């Protein structure tokens, strides 16, 4: 409920229409126009011309990366893909019929137990590092659980592949075609940010 003060009396408005929880410059969903904007860029332009890694940099830094910035970000993703062995044990302990979303939630929660910076939320660079780590590790968790529930070996990430390609590799055990890679990359871009979730405040 949102409480507003009118000239005559207090009133209680149902719903969230009058509630401002926070403001963001990261993305803007313009539903009436059918537009999604990331940091001033139309999602259609980004999906057509950018990579997922470039979009992550845009969302983290507010601008598209130059070559050096992009190379550094890619290296950071590759360096953070490995899962702690204890987390693999947690995934192996889950029943095979566990919902993949429940397995992912459990995996992400367990990651916090292995992260020495888990409680560091007052330092923007530490939060950014944790974000990069999660972006790199979430697909690995999903792929690992997918393969475990099919009695298949968990595959090692390929440092020569980008985030979208590596995910396909980890799931299938096959290097993706250019079309598969681009399709997954676009999916990643479209889901990179979608406004402010009511469930987060």
Across the structure, where does each feature detected by a protein language model lie?
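Hydrophobic alpha-helical bundle cores within soluble ligand-binding/oligomerization subdomains
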Residues: 2-201
